[in-house]
Curated annotation (Swiss-Prot):
Domain (TRAM) ranges: 6-64
Catalysis: reaction(s): uridine(747) in 23S rRNA + S-adenosyl-L-methionine = 5-methyluridine(747) in 23S rRNA + S-adenosyl-L-homocysteine + H(+); uridine(1939) in 23S rRNA + S-adenosyl-L-methionine = 5-methyluridine(1939) in 23S rRNA + S-adenosyl-L-homocysteine + H(+)
Stated name of the protein: 23S rRNA (uracil-C(5))-methyltransferase RlmCD
Keywords: 4Fe-4S, Iron, Iron-sulfur, Metal-binding, Methyltransferase, rRNA processing, S-adenosyl-L-methionine, Transferase
Function: Catalyzes the formation of 5-methyl-uridine at positions 747 (m5U747) and 1939 (m5U1939) in 23S rRNA.
Active site per the UniProt annotation: 415 (nucleophile)
Length: 459
């Protein structure tokens, strides 16, 4: 006989919140049945309304707070509750850092089955000023009442919230997005309409070199024509003298994917430049480049510390991207080999190595799980292996290769604690031991957390 859930849709309940989900929603229970409620915090008492009931859990919304958490604060962003970009602005920054450390510990125990009495999970490294950190703004453009709107999508919808400023974006990016929107509106540019697949301007992207002050403007358009091109370029460059590059990307497809395959520089340079520490990077419209360079340096300094390089080591950097970690490692290692599946990223990595005068970094295109075993057969072995995989974590074949190669230490840089925990279990079963985990707050006010992990071969 099927058990009926103890809560009903549209009914009101008085609850106490016990925990947060990894997405940042409050968790309350009615007769042991979990209800997930956005904008609620542990230890808070509230009246909620149930909005959706599933077999094993329900969703609700906050109606009235009766007791507040000491970590509750007023979200400074006026559109925080509508916009889907941040999840934790209603929590003090100290509370966010504690939540992220706890999140990491939880998954290491639950998914990784690690004994945390033997692993040091450090307090989360946060920012002194956790606002205006993003160096890239990428906003959809739409039309409302005959004018252009540009902003972010409302939660769980494709309705654009027009906004003049985003508190986690570099303010220079906000200014540029607004100016480009106004300039385009001035010349009667038509925004792309997703439903009808008509109109021209789909997205505006702005990239900003925080150290160099250089800026790139990218127009993502449905067709390859560019109405009023000369005038629009003239207006942008007059208003923003630090713009070094204006680019058009053409995406003719009926899709949610932002970029199309064709990218053309329509004014200025192909690249802008920025520095992380003393390493210089060339950034194109499509380059993957960390959006918070200040915290990226914190993360990479920790990776260097865990690598313990003395100048005589060979290091392999799996998932090397445009060479960001590789070029930090190359300053202290004898030789660094980087591998990455995206050919354009490897071109960028080689360019960045040249830019920094690195002669001891070598890069190859391919799947890490294919290229690294080939290197192993050729006699290229690593004293230290660094992995910085995408959210899905390391490929199983790569983990098997690591276990076979037996590098003395592995430094794992992760953007997803769940897949990190899964992969650590595989490495532990293969003869490794997890020593230290350092959470880093790369994206304040969101539910994301990065980690740097020191893993050593058992002696």
């Amino acid at each position: 006989m099927k058990m009926k859930p103890p809560v009903e849709k549209n009914e009101y309940y008085d609850v106490t919140f016990e925990d947060l989900t990894h997405e940042g929603a409050g968790v309350a229970k009615v007769q042991g049945f979990p209800i997930f409620v956005p904008n609620a915090l542990p230890e808070e008492k509230a009246q909620i309304k149930v909005t959706r009931v599933k077999k094993g859990f329900a969703f609700g919304r906050l109606i009235e707070l009766k007791e507040e958490s000491p970590h509750r604060t007023d979200a400074p962003c006026p559109i925080y509750k509508q916009c889907g970009g941040c999840q934790l602005q209603h929590m003090t920054y100290e509370g966010q850092l504690l939540f992220k450390q706890k999140q990491v510990k939880d998954v290491l125990e639950r998914i990784g089955k690690l004994d945390l009495s033997k692993v040091t999970v450090h307090p989360t490294l946060g920012m002194e000023d956790p606002w205006n950190y993003r160096n890239k703004a990428q906003v959809p453009v739409g039309e409302r009442e005959g004018g252009l709107v540009a902003g972010f999508y409302q939660q769980r919808s494709h309705d654009i919230i027009d906004m003049s400023a985003c508190l986690i974006q570099q303010s220079k990016n906000d200014e540029a997005v607004q100016a480009v929107k106004d300039i385009c509106a001035n010349y009667g540019v038509k925004a792309y309409n997703e439903e009808r697949h008509k109109g021209w301007l789909r997205h505006i992207m702005v990239r900003y070199g925080v150290v160099t002050g250089e800026m790139m403007i990218v127009f993502i358009t449905r067709t390859s024509d560019f109405p009023h091109k000369a005038k629009i370029i003239e207006d942008i460059t007059a208003q923003f003298p630090h713009v070094k590059s204006i680019v058009q990307n053409i995406n003719p497809n009926k899709t949610n994917v932002i970029f199309g395959n064709e990218t053309n520089v329509i004014w200025g340079e192909e690249y802008i430049y920025d520095l992380i520490g003393d390493v210089k990077f060339a950034i194109s419209a499509r380059s993957f480049y960390q959006v918070n360079p200040e915290q990226t340096k914190v993360l990479y300094d920790k990776a260097l510390e865990y690598a313990e390089l003395q100048g005589e080591e060979t290091v392999i950097d799996a998932y090397c991207g445009i060479g960001t970690i590789s070029l930090f490692l190359a300053k202290q290692a004898k030789k660094v080999y980087g591998v990455e599946i995206v050919p354009e990223a490897i071109e960028d990595a080689k360019r960045n190595a040249e830019l920094n005068g690195n002669t001891n970094a070598e890069f190859a295109v391919g799947e890490a799980e294919t290229v690294i075993p080939k290197w192993y057969e050729e006699g290229i072995t690593a004293d230290t292996l660094v992995v910085d995989p995408p959210r899905k974590g390391c490929d199983e074949a790569l983990l098997r290769t690591i276990v076979e190669m037996k590098p003395k230490r592995v430094v794992y840089v992760s953007c997803n604690p769940g897949t990190l925990a899964r992969d650590l279990r595989v490495l532990e079963d293969g003869g490794y031991v997890t020593r230290e985990v350092q959470p880093v707050d790369m994206f304040p006010h969101t539910n994301h957390v990065e980690c740097c992990v020191l893993i050593k071969l058992k002696e």
